[in-house]
Amino acid sequence: MSVDEKPIKIKVEKVSKIFGKQTKKAVQMLANGKTKKEILKATGSTVGVNQADFEVYDGEIFVIMGLSGSGKSTLVRMLNRLIEPTAGNIYIDGDMITNMSKDQLREVRRKKISMVFQKFALFPHRTILENTEYGLELQGVDKQERQQKALESLKLVGLEGFEHQYPDQLSGGMQQRVGLARALTNDPDILLMDEAFSALDPLIRKDMQDELLDLHDNVGKTIIFITHDLDEALRIGDRIVLMKDGNIVQIGTPEEILMNPSNEYVEKFVEDVDLSKVLTAGHIMKRAETVRIDKGPRVALTLMKNLGISSIYAVDKQKKLLGVIYASDAKKAAESDLSLQDILNTEFTTVPENTYLTEIFDVVSDANIPIAVVDEKQRMKGIVVRGALIGALAGNNEYINAEGTNEQTQDPSAQEVK
């Protein structure tokens, strides 16, 4: 399903937050294009968020990032009205939450939205299980039911067996998992995560990012993730919002942010990113010419001659990759009346589309033929050649497929290892 076909989970329309007294005047000045500094000087009020406008799709990991003071935490707290918007509207599943009563809002917070903060805020005198079930306890849920749900959530985050421990017996990373489990116990549609991993050591932080991605694959929640770390945003986000001084300066996929920055600020923000840890084989693969295994060696020879290559991948009728045919072997087979199956070489390397370039650099460098890119059914999707890998790592857009898939016809010469 394409992004455009996914149902909209959250819709934010021209939402602003003004801190101060002259909010109406400040909102009008924003509408007239005045800057944050101009509004502060004229009204004494501070612009926290300026006319934010975006949609979040169901099941998406939507990252809001920016430096300190950019407005990202203010924005996420307006999504559940922990901070009241000064202007604009917010919809969840089509329901406008900005005009809900306290009772209606309380119901939304209980059933649809949970929040995970940077500080774990666990009760030291309660066990891990008791901390995890606390939200359901406040709702008056039966003890047996809430403990069962809490145990299921702890299992999801890898803490099965720790339910009778106390917070001070757990590491920082494990405590943050408890916070995540507590949020999941309510079975919300939406998780708001505000700098949830920022206080953790780098190695633990990466583990938690992996845990979050695995969890997302398993339960499919819509996640709004706040961070100031670009590497973290690029690693986990389906789409990223970049903020500065309360303004949204760009919204896009990680690839769009990296390869097509909207202005100089974004360009500087991403200039030091290690592309090898962001781009994948799918971003640089080219269309692969192949030969069906049921064709004869003369067909394979003709294809290779026309393409100017010395080897070609062989596939079956379903495009499943079977092996490599070398020109020298095909020539001998044609002279000896052998089939392609008789000369099929099955010693070759494949990589999935989502393999990061940092993981395939050595493989591509050592290979004497292009590396085959395959899907989960071992069907041929494309090839990676050395020249494209080097060009992409150098930041040359010519070698990068915008959406991480190969949609363009390749120059046959690209089949050769260069």
Curated annotation (Swiss-Prot):
Give residue ranges for domain CBS. 284-340, 344-403
Per the UniProt entry, what are the Gene Ontology biological process annotations, in alphabetical order?
amino acid transport; glycine betaine transport
- Name the catalysed reactions: a quaternary ammonium(out) + ATP + H2O = a quaternary ammonium(in) + ADP + phosphate + H(+)
Annotated Gene Ontology cellular components are: membrane
Report the residue ranges that make up the ABC transporter domain in this protein: 34-270
Q: Name one Pfam family in it.
A: CBS
- For whether the record's keyword set contains ATP-binding, the answer is yes
- Residues annotated for ATP binding in this entry: G66, L67, S68, G69, S70, G71, K72, S73
Its domain of life? Bacteria
User: Which InterPro entries does the UniProt entry name for this protein?
Assistant: AAA+_ATPase, ABC_osmolyte_uptake_ATP-bind, ABC_transporter-like_ATP-bd, ABC_transporter-like_CS, CBS_dom, CBS_dom_sf, Gly-betaine_transp_ATP-bd, P-loop_NTPase
Molecular function (Gene Ontology), one example: ATP binding
EC numbers, comma separated: 7.6.2.9
EC supergroup of this enzyme: translocase
Keyword set, alphabetical order: Amino-acid transport, ATP-binding, CBS domain, Nucleotide-binding, Repeat, Translocase, Transport
Q: Note the NCBIfam families from the entry.
A: proV (TIGR01186)
Q: Which PANTHER family match?
A: GLYCINE BETAINE/PROLINE BETAINE TRANSPORT SYSTEM ATP-BINDING PROTEIN PROV, GLYCINE BETAINE_PROLINE BETAINE TRANSPORT SYSTEM ATP-BINDING PROTEIN PROV
Subunit-level organization: The complex is composed of two ATP-binding proteins (OpuAA), two transmembrane proteins (OpuAB) and a solute-binding protein (OpuAC).
According to its UniProt entry, the function of this protein is described as: Involved in a multicomponent binding-protein-dependent transport system for glycine betaine. Probably responsible for energy coupling to the transport system.
Family note = Belongs to the ABC transporter superfamily.
This chain's protein is named: Glycine betaine transport ATP-binding protein OpuAA
Give the gene symbol.
opuAA
